[in-house]
Amino acid sequence: MAKQRSTPDSSKVPPRPSTARSKPAAGRRPPSRTAANRRRQQRRLAIIGSGVAVVVIAVLVIVGVTSGSGSGSGSSQLTPVSAAELAQVTSVPTSTLVAAAGAAPGGTVSPPTNLPATTPTLTSASKPEIVYMGAEYCPYCAAERWPLVMALSKFGTFHNLSSTKSSSTDVNPNTPTFSFYGSSYTSPYLTFTPVELENRLGKPLQKPTAAQNQLINTYDAPPYTQGSGGSIPFVDLGGKFLISGTEYDGSALSNKSFTSAVGYMTSASNPTSRAAEAVAGHLIGTICSLTNDQPASVCSTVPASLKTGQAAAANQGSSSGG
């Protein structure tokens, strides 16, 4: 499957190779974007500068106001996810996700890529660490969060998740999704560290650490990624596996409400939900390889074939200018 990627702000990270968005599933090119939106999509990743604290505070105020105001599609709206909605997503059985991964037609999903054996392991608090970097405006990040929540919930518990939607002016506009901003995750088996770089309006949210910047500058680029790299979503799984770009086509989610999307993505009755569940199954397998097959209640149901990623050479998504 050709990976789908968004590219953040170039003014906020040391120079990296120019980016190119991969074609979406079935070889469809994204619709043409306005010049202003294209410039925003080409912006880079890190948020630097002495004025960042002031900007972030301003953004937090904006988010707090709009999340309670019921503003229209142009607002940066965060809404707490209800316990019932979260339970519906996280309670999809492991066996269902694993079976979906095994049954997924070729080309519909793209499993994590293996990093070289010499890559330093990524740990935090003496546990394997998974680092996610994305942005709320990014439609491909929006799609990727669904299987991430499904898979990670088998190893731990999310707290204070919010719902949001991707930019209204990007491809796949208003894709409903979770936001990891302001959330936390607890697990005895692994550490999950999410960084939401910008909100759906493209305003800064979280500043990556120097170590996180080094990760994405090193591994979100050739030879580890197809094309010129520099894309989000970016996920480093324990220094062993890599995701750069979404792993399936989530375009059918565009303009759905979050509540509608919860039902749609857990129904296993449409190609999008089946693909997302397959991605979650692959994620569970690779995470089990990081946690030494713990917990056994989860990992004992996962075949060995899902506990390895795909070879880097298999990451052959055709790239095109966007």
Where are these regions (language model features)?
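Non-globular targeting/processing and membrane-anchoring segments
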Residues: A2-E129, A143, S153-G322
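Short active-site neighborhood of thiol/selenol oxidoreductases, capturing the structured segment around
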Residues: S124-P139, L148-M150
